[in-house]
Amino acid sequence: MVTSCCSGSMSEAGHILDGLAEHARRASRSLARANAGTRNHALSEAAKALRVRSDEIVAANQKDLAALSEDRNAAFRDRLTLTPERVEAMARGLEDVAGLPDPVGRVLAEWDRPNGLHFRRVATPLGVIGMIYESRPNVGADAAALCIKSGNAVILRGGGESLHSARAIQAAMEDGLRAAGLDEACVQILPSADRALVGAMLQASGKIDLIIPRGGKSLVERVQREARVPVLAHADGLNHTYIHASADPAMARKILLDAKMRRTGICGATETLLIDAAIAPALLPLLVEDLAAKGCTFRADDRARAIVPTLAAASADDFDTEWLDAVLSVAVVDGVEDALDHIARHGSSHTEAIIAEDPEAAAEFLNGTDSAVVMWNASTQFCDGGEFGFGAEIGIATGRMHARGPVGLEQLTCYRYEVIGTGQVRG
């Protein structure tokens, strides 16, 4: 459901948002009552619609790409780009979500009391979710799928650069909802890139139950600063891969190349390499050679530059930078504790990995890292809801309340208590 937006004033934006939220609340009530088969049917039909509309979606995406300013880097363009293959991946993602167990109505716990009352805690939808994301248009499809499956209505706000793409994807989601007999207002998008509409979303206490921002640091900070609605924040993916002295060199080369260069513009990409001083003289030149051959550049500390003098010197801010590009920060460290200290100073609590053959070193790293996801001998690019078996994800939560790591179906539910009696009274 798309409403026209003709002004940037907060009053008009608030009026438009109120209408969207009212429709979403009504839709959320009907969606919560729909059985799992109906919700799954909507997702299957939406997947079909994505395939039918694939040419239309790619053409809309080309409009977004054509309007993109020339100063946007290659990684940003890659995040924005949709191809027939990526549309097909979106469709398969919807089908994967449809095939997951129903998260609604699960009995999370149950117990009896001495007075004969039976208690149970049952998973329920959250209600209306506001999703604010940036350039990747496929995020809208993933978010819509997870919300439909978990019985939540969603209001989507994508980046202004992807508005044509978002509208084309939205049409496919509406096709699926309509085919299943569900309210099309289960999935809505903000009608324009007007920032006043984002402000209205953030102020919609009592109308939107949860805001999930997915994007860069400035977006997340604005949402956290201005929101009067609960926020499930997705922070920077300032991820580290630490190569321990016991690492198998061939494994380390393979993992780091994937962790950095498979897709440089996603939040699961490694942004900093930490390499143990004991292995750095032999291994670091090989790692640099592998990555440079794929177009990667480097920002290195003095110890790394002493081993590979051609590396550019790191500035004071480089180890605090989420590059989202073919750039890697490099530091030499003295063991696990030094690596953990570096991560504590510079990390974003997203994803860290250790490459090691020594299980004691790996255990020390896993237990000592206060991040949402910690890996051993695996690429940080596995930090993805699909790879976790969640079907898709709506973001990576790095806070400590309600959810951490990839946010999938389970994290989009809350619960109610049901109390079953046989006529008990308290008096």
UniProtKB/Swiss-Prot annotation:
Keyword Oxidoreductase (UniProt): yes
Reactions mediated catalytically: L-glutamate 5-semialdehyde + phosphate + NADP(+) = L-glutamyl 5-phosphate + NADPH + H(+)
Protein keywords: Amino-acid biosynthesis, Cytoplasm, NADP, Oxidoreductase, Proline biosynthesis
Enzyme class: oxidoreductase
A GO MF term: glutamate-5-semialdehyde dehydrogenase activity
Pathway: Amino-acid biosynthesis; L-proline biosynthesis; L-glutamate 5-semialdehyde from L-glutamate: step 2/2
EC number of the protein: 1.2.1.41
The keyword Transcription regulation is assigned to this record: no
Subcellular compartments: Cytoplasm
One GO biological process term: L-proline biosynthetic process
One CC-aspect GO term: cytoplasm
Gene3D superfamilies: Aldehyde Dehydrogenase, Chain A, domain 1, Aldehyde Dehydrogenase, Chain A, domain 2
Pfam family, one: Aldedh
Stored SUPFAM superfamilies: ALDH-like
Family listed: Belongs to the gamma-glutamyl phosphate reductase family.
Function, as annotated: Catalyzes the NADPH-dependent reduction of L-glutamate 5-phosphate into L-glutamate 5-semialdehyde and phosphate. The product spontaneously undergoes cyclization to form 1-pyrroline-5-carboxylate.
Stated name of the protein: Gamma-glutamyl phosphate reductase
Source organism of the structure: Gluconobacter oxydans (strain 621H) (Gluconobacter suboxydans)
Lineage: Bacteria, Pseudomonadati, Pseudomonadota, Alphaproteobacteria, Acetobacterales
